[in-house]
Regions:
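C-terminal regulatory/interaction module of P-loop NTP-utilizing enzymes
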Residues: 1-181
Length: 181
């Protein structure tokens, strides 16, 4: 109730992994009239006019039919209807991804390091295109690129780091396709 009554931006990460009993409580918060009843306290609280609620979901609330996001649930259509704005985010541009990787790996912020990171991002982009086209079933996220960079620093071997960070997660039948990237 505290966040609801204050100028807070509340973010529910992996919203579609929420339990249905919790989701029904949240449904009332999504109503536009700005009131919420605390039954255990016999009290009605009013929403702060600057309170904002955000959520992230890999399945956009439609559930997972692919098996990629095990543990997610289909969100009740009435609740999905209460979200006034729903949007999709694509992957970052190569430049933005580069900036994030370099910010987390300052030792790579030099000509040689930038070239290595640029090549890693190109490989990641190829896996994303392969995933979208249905050629491969595992995608390299920006988090995976960060892990690949970290592991390449640990092992001092970009190829080995690629295998332990990404390739070992892939289906054996797809490894030849990935090798072409």
């Amino acid at each position: 109730p505290w966040s609801f009554q204050n100028p807070v931006a509340l973010v529910f990460d992996e919203y579609d992994a929420g339990r249905s009993d919790v989701m029904f409580v949240l449904q009332r918060i999504l109503e536009s009239d700005g009131y919420f009843t605390l039954l255990d306290r016999n009290k009605v609280v009013k929403q702060n006019s600057y309170f904002r609620l955000f959520a992230t979901a890999n399945t956009i609330g439609l559930g997972d039919t692919t098996g990629l996001y095990t543990g997610t649930q289909q969100i009740n259509q009435a609740q999905l209807d209460r979200w006034e704005i729903v949007t999709s985010l694509n992957y970052l541009s190569s430049d933005n991804e580069m900036n994030i990787v370099l910010a987390k790996n300052k030792q790579l912020n030099n000509i040689k390091g930038k070239e290595r990171v640029s090549n890693m991002i190109k490989v990641a982009s190829l896996t994303r295109k392969g995933f979208v086209s249905g050629d491969i079933s595992t995608v390299m996220s920006p988090r995976t690129v960060l892990n690949w960079c970290n592991n390449s620093e640990i092992f001092k071997d970009v190829g080995y780091a690629f295998r332990v960070t990404f390739l070992n997660k892939c289906d054996n039948s797809e490894k030849n396709i990935i090798a072409e990237y």
